Amino acid sequence: MSTKGRKLTVATFVLLFLLTACNQPVDTGSSNTQIMLAAYTVPKEAYQKEIIPAFQKQWKEKTGQTVTFKESYVGSGAQARAIVNGLEADVAALSLEGDIETIHKAGLITHDWKQRPHNGMITRSVVAFGVKKGNPLTIREWQDLTKPGIAVLYPSPRTSGGAMWDINAIYGAGLKMAEMETGKKDPDRGRELLSAIQKNVKVMDNSGRESMTTFEKGLGDVVVTYENELLLRNMEQPLYDVIYPKATILIENPVALVDKNVDKHGNRAVVEAFVAYLQSTEAQRAFAKYGFRPVDPTVMAETKDKFPEPEWLFDIDYLGGWATASEQIYGPQGVWTGIVEGKKGS
């Protein structure tokens, strides 16, 4: 073989070696690894200021690896669609079960994510009202949001999981109030309450975080949002009164490892450890610090004075579960769809 031929053979071998090496899983055999976290907007501070740094420290001490994070924070529904459309997230930490199921149905999550403790949930909250300090308009209950001249804010359910929780809370409150008065749920009461409040909604932003930003700019008399969004704003100084209506919904927020992306990236060990860490006592205390209700019973007991229990609290099962609620409220003939399109929903 000529010298030139030998040089080409060596060069080809080196190139093939490098390409092969670059496609090998980067896990505990390397000094560095990476996690791509795709989350809804609301827990951004908890992740960036507490949870990610604590996990990085723990993982470094355990394995010697430095783990870096790429992060994306947008509305939950938009985030789910981004993952389905090619965002290579290793972890989906979203607002609601249905958004995780969107990724699952696309074939990207292949395991039973609800088999984790707490059915795969990592935080809880409730839907509450935020009003200006001192509550100048004396807003106490959902009916107060139907009064003429009251400017209401909540985001759009087309992009925001938080908005779906808000709308579920309103519709469910109508059912609950009817049940407490008559002994039976009345869908008409739910529709009437939702329709009356929707007439007073001035802006529907893309996410719960954007709705809070709009409220902070001085637009609106009341923002319907996650309790934790309001507690976060009040951490350093009390900016808003947090109002808990008697009837409201318990919010539960899921997380799941995205199998197809993890297998492509070869980082399953560190991603599984991070997902497990989110339910640890340490992470649950961090979530509680930023206003989220813990799923861990021990941490919830430690923080119970921070989180009032609304009198007529209900969960998604009260509305028949997510599949039923999605169809009856947001489907083509759904209640909310009918209201915003100017026709009577089913």
Name the predicted role of every residue range.
Residues 104-176:
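A conserved helix-loop-strand patch within extracytoplasmic ligand-binding domains
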Residues 121-126, 190-198, 205, 236-268, ...:
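Periplasmic-binding protein-like
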